[in-house]
Amino acid sequence: MSFMNPVDMVDEDAADLQFPKEFENAETLLISEVHMLLDHRKRQNESADEEQEFSEVFMKTYAYTDSFRKFKNKETIMSARSLLMQKKLHKFELAALGNLCPEAPEEAKALIPSLEGRFEDEELRQILDDIGTKRSLQY
C-alpha cells in the first residue's frame, strides 16, 4: 500500500489557477479549434481511397464541438486566440473565455473566478466586447 507524500499533494483548484503538475506543459484548445481538427480528420477520411468508419466517441465529440463552438472559421479562431493571448491571461482563463464567451464582466467572473481581482471591470469588458465583435463579424 503506498501513501502519498503530503509535500507532493497540491490542492487542485481552477478558481485559484492551481492545477496538477501534469498540466504545467499542456496547452489548452478552444472548442472551435478542436472542431476544426476533427473536421480536418473527417474530410481527410472522406477523401481517402478506403473510407473508414469513425468511432461513436469521435462522432459524438464532433457533434458536441459543432454545437458549442463559438467561432466558425479558421481566420476568426486565429484572430480570437491572438486577441486573448495579448492579455495577461492564464491559459485556462484564455480557453474558458474563448469557449464560454461571456457578455459581461460579472458573468465572466462568476464563470471564471480567477479573473476576480486580476482585471478591472472596464478592462474585462473591453476583452469581452472585442471577442463579441469577432463573433459577430464572422462569416
Curated annotation (Swiss-Prot):
Keyword Cell division: no
GO molecular function: nucleotide binding; translation initiation factor binding
Pfam families: RNA_pol_Rpb4
GO biological process: transcription by RNA polymerase II; transcription initiation at RNA polymerase II promoter
Statement: the UniProt record of this protein carries the keyword Nucleus: yes
Main location: nucleus
InterPro entries: HRDC-like_sf, RNA_pol_Rpb4/RPC9_core, Rpb4-like, Rpb4/RPC9, Rpb4/RPC9_sf
Subcellular localization: Nucleus; Chromosome
GO cellular component: polytene chromosome; polytene chromosome interband; polytene chromosome puff; RNA polymerase II, core complex
Note in the entry: This protein is produced by a bicistronic gene which also produces the Ada2a protein by alternative splicing. Three distinct zinc-containing RNA polymerases are found in eukaryotic nuclei: polymerase I for the ribosomal RNA precursor, polymerase II for the mRNA precursor, and polymerase III for 5S and tRNA genes.
Family the entry assigns: Belongs to the eukaryotic RPB4 RNA polymerase subunit family.
Subunit-level organization: RNA polymerase II consists of 12 different subunits.
Protein name: DNA-directed RNA polymerase II subunit Rpb4
Organism of provenance: Drosophila melanogaster (Fruit fly)
